[in-house]
Swiss-Prot record:
Its EC number is 2.7.10.1. This is Tyrosine-protein kinase Mer. Disulfide bonds join 109-170, 213-257. The gene is Mertk. Autophosphorylated on Tyr-744, Tyr-748 and Tyr-749 in the activation loop allowing full activity. Autophosphorylated on Tyr-867 leading to recruitment of downstream partners of the signaling cascade such as PLCG2. GO terms for molecular function: ATP binding; transmembrane receptor protein tyrosine kinase activity. CDD domains: FN3, IgI_2_Axl_Tyro3_like, PTKc_Mer. Residues 86-181, 192-268 form the Ig-like C2-type domain. The modification Phosphoserine is found at residue 538. It comes from Rattus norvegicus. The modification Phosphotyrosine is found at residues 744, 748-749, 867.
Amino acid sequence: MVLAPLLLGLLLLSALWNGGTAEKEEEIKPDQPFSGPLPGSLPADHRPFFAPHSSGDQLSPSQTGRSHPAHTATPQMTSAASNLLPPVAFKNTIGRIVLSEHKSVKFNCSINIPNVYQETAGISWWKDGKELLGAHHSITQFYPDEEGVSIIALFSITSVQRSDNGSYICKMKVNDREVVSDPIYVEVQGLPYFTKQPESVNVTRNTAFNLTCQAVGPPEPVNIFWVQNSSRVNENPERSPSVLTVAGLTETAVFSCEAHNDKGLTVSKGVQINIKVIPSPPTEVHILNSTAHSILVSWVPGFDGYSPLQNCSIQVKEADQLSNGSVMVFNTSASPHLYEVQQLQALANYSVTVSCRNEIGWSAVSPWILASTTEGAPAVAPLNITVFLNESSNNLEIRWTKPPIKRQDGELVGYRISHVWESAGTSKELSEEVSQNGSWAQVPVQMHNATCTVRIAVITKGGIGPFSEPVDVAIPEHSRVDYAPSSTPAPGNTESMLIILGCFCGFVLMGLILYLSLAIKRRVQETKFGGAFSEEDSQLVVNYRAKKSFCRRAIELTLQSLGVSEELQNKLEDVVVDRNLLILGKVLGEGEFGSVMEGNLKQEDGTSQKVAVKTMKLDNFSLREIEEFLSEAACMKDFNHPNVIRLLGVCIELSSQGIPKPMVILPFMKYGDLHTFLLYSRIESVPKSIPLQTLLKFMVDIAQGMEYLSSRNFLHRDLAARNCMLRDDMTVCVADFGLSKKIYSGDYYRQGRIAKMPVKWIAIESLADRVYTSKSDVWAFGVTMWEIATRGMTPYPGVQNHEMYDYLLHGHRLKQPEDCLDDLYEIMYSCWSADPLDRPTFSVLRLQLEKLSESLPDAQDKESIIYINTQLLESCEGLANRSSLAGLDMNIDPDSIIASCTAGAAVSVVMAEVHENNLHEERYILNGGNEEWEDVASTPFATVTAGKDGVLPEDRLTKNGISWSHHSTLPLGSPSPDELLFADDSSGDSEVLM
């Protein structure tokens, strides 16, 4: 009976409890159903709730506001009771996942938590022992039921990378106990990945070296193939890592490695293996500062040859031709690129060059430059000093010998004489100065019964040198009668007579020496020329006919000694000039094969003519070369046309070793070449406009000259604006026949050897097989017309020399200048026909140009016809030595200063076979003026008349002015050469040799 009420109470409490739990479950159901799959152990009608989270921020049921009923209704359990709870563990995972790179992957871990557990934490993801915080996306889902709650943690990676490889686990804390899931291994497979690639190295020629390549998977294994210059080195692969041993190389090569696995292959970067060579010569050698005994040399190191420069050597030698030629060598470190050369003589000229060394060897020396030391104080005192007392004049006579010129260290100004007089208790110090020509002096006696100490020093503009060793002289008591200032000394002074007699004897001796030297010189000449004169002829002092006969005989003997044929000797009678009639002056310019010198040629009437003399540099000439040289001179002597340069003569000079050296004598033209004239019209600070009528006149002049040469079967082969000269009346004449040849058989000439040629002026058929015809000169004339129309621009801007043949072969030609008439461009374009037979002759070209010139109106007035302010040749001496013009590229040939007819190879041309591309070369433009050219500018052209209706062509040079004054290269993405119409880009067209 007692238990019945108790059981009834328990049943009532149980009913109340179940009702409260159901009501709580009704509150925590989510509003939206779960769309994903349900755990297999849960009823299908359960509605879970889930919480997305990142960085391990897991939400427990209590945190989401949807706690399980057991968590709110179950009373607190004691520690002893918690130990009796059933164990909690994660369900088994998928274990291992293998997939390829860039794929997506999802995996999860799940756990059931009974209601009896009150304290639970969220699930966190761990990879390789480190908790994942914020780097990946995960979602935690909760599925509550009557017995507890099921928790599923989803983890996803959208595009897996190799870095996602690893072991993933879930962790959770339940009642302060950590629960860990089984690991999920994720393996990402893909192409091999390089952990070490080959590296570029610089090696010595034929020396072994190693290259290393290492790559990893997964999948493994990874096999390595080596590639050299796009060809496999090993037929059988090697397992990674692989080391390739190369026995040695003789030239540069590119190596790479291929890594293969089941997914494919990966190719490493290509590395270049460079062969160490000797360095290039230093460039830009300059003298930064000079003193009396030192010079400061600077230079820019050349290419190091893939090996660091170790040290440099500065070589210095005296520039004086009379010096012994000894070279002083100064070694210094490679950096800094400066060195002060000391222990030099003052006021002296030196030649300086620099060479540098790496581990392979020494570079070639840089071009020699000239350095001069300044004037300094003398290094020595006068020599042989003697002092004696002249009692008759009461003076001290002091004599000395001048120090050696090389020890004077400057221009001698005079001497300073210091004389100190000392007597008992008295001392007086005086000094005198003597002019530079003196070697003796008189000093009045200042004291008697005293001692005079004399010292002498040399004076130059650089200062006063050291005094000589002192010379003492005793002055005795004075016992003679003092004369008044107006008195004369007593007679009997024989020393003055001795001086006069000595001077007379000296003059007689000098005259005798001069006479003997002239006699010896005459005898040497007679011996040299084979005794051309009889004894009677040699007695004639003034007889022009006899001297002329002597010259002809000397020429005949010289030609006979050279072995020249008799027929050629007859042709050269009026061409070869006696060497004694030619006086050489300064050097105007130097080329690779010759130099141009200023000279004076004596005429028959006793006057002299200023000429230009072109000499050949070679030290030795074969008989065939001499005959070719003289034969061409004999042919060109007959040229008689106002638009063709005239040959004045040829001279054969015998060196001290008896080697004949030919020289060509040509008219001296101070106004220079046509290219320079046109260039200055465009690049001056205030550009000058040249009327179109004047430009056409230039073209007509050249066409007339070439028509004359063509009619005489002469090929020029180097026709360009730089080889056309301007006479004093501004008439253009064709010059520089250094490449010209006479053609006798047929109408062509084939060049038999590789020579330097002006590539951008050469016809397409000549570039192909080196065959030249008169139509090849027509092609060059078309390019010259384009030069004139563009006021001196370089043809084919942006196109390199080695690209010219392909450029022309594809039909490209020079574009029409912007201010060029259509009719004029049609004429020049006809000169560039691919078929030489389709090109017009020079006669047709001359007629077309004259007709076009006549159709144009006259220039507006004579004042509008100007001469360009070009510097005179005389004022340009030393121009090539200026450092600011070291990179000058204006296609100016030093030989084009004069009209050259030499048979030697022309300078200022480029080999067609050369394929070097100087991408960093810059082009500089000369600016400057000269008063003499300004005077010429006031004189109109002789052939152009002014008219009231004349129209001055529009000046369009603003586009071709300063914006084109520097060289530009063609980087990737630049316009094609066809679009670069007016770029003044030399691109290595010619080699300027000065």
